[in-house]
Amino acid sequence: VLLEKMAEMLKKRGLSLLITIDEISSTPELREFAGIYQLLLRNNYHIALLMAGLPNKVSELQNDELLTFLLRSQRIYLEPLSLLTIKQSYRRAFNRKGRTIDDDTLNQITKMTNGYAYAFQLLGFLLWRTKETEITSAVVQKILPNYQAELYRNVYIKMYQELSNKDREFIKAMSESGKASVKVAEIAKKMHRDKNYISIYRRRLLDDQLITATKWGEVAFTLPFFADFIKEYQTLY
């Protein structure tokens, strides 16, 4: 009722309302809100909705049987950050404060992010916190365990636990190959299934942006050190 009154006031003044929601999840509250939003649209209020979240959470919300109207909304997939942009950003940040880093080390830390925005921020923070005036490969190796642990704890564990058993089996087969880019045929063989069967899980993991198609018939992890995480998780749990 309050939202409708607000929308009515803005409409009379010739104004529109944009509502933004971050880190969406298919909760009862969000489903209720989405229903109210749909009703406001039907009543021709000038209102728009912008939501952001992990790909699997967005898919879950769009596929809710009560919220199928969301399937008509425009979905924008965020691409990984450009490695060149990451490299330039690191260089500027360190040089601005008089801290040096050679090109080889700069390339090393850039590749360690794999274009993942959170990894870019986290790695930069951990290196900055060392207070070293020269960022060397030795400094990078020193913070590497902490970098991996933070990725695992803050992001990867929750992502992994929300996957289906077959999705887990798929990425486990990928991690066991030891290759950066893995043939789908090899994954199917490890899962003792044909390629048509596992294509469902391949498609789902692609939609969730956990893997990417690197070349015809091959896939790779999108997240840095994700294969290492899977192996460690399997060992510990």
PLM feature spans:
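Helix-loop-helix "sensor" segment of P-loop NTPases
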Residues: 57-111, 132-135
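Conserved strand-to-helix beginnings and helix N-cap segments that scaffold or border functional pockets
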Residues: 30-34, 63, 87, 167, ...
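C-terminal leucine-rich, beta-strand-based interaction scaffolds used for sensing/assembly
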Residues: 42, 104, 149-237
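Short, glycine/charged-enriched secondary-structure capping and boundary segments
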Residues: 32-36, 64-68, 92, 226, ...
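Conserved Walker B catalytic segment
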Residues: 1-55, 63-66
